[in-house]
């Protein structure tokens, strides 16, 4: 089930509003959504487990909280999504989290992407600079079809 990116971002904002009540000023949130990507089709709730992981490992685990940046941009014929945090980070081996405590969110996300896009996707974890973790998703850019209405 795919939705327009603008719907996915709206759902993410609602979830993060709840988390902001919980963490108050300890949670910093930034959205960087490139104009023209709003109608891109993405799997429904694809950002949710990534944001939940960032909350759990980067914000809740730090006394001073943390920051989460959610980015979407076009790259050729692809859509790039990124959830980055400034938490303590994790041990990464070949783009995968090395420890077993990364939860099922990333595994489920990868399985969903594989089911929807076969081999035409990427899910990669990298170190955020100066600290933290970045989860990057690359999927084919597909735009929501707008209905033509008779004049």
Spans of features found by a protein language model:
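C-terminal end segment of the histidine kinase catalytic
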Residues: 128-151
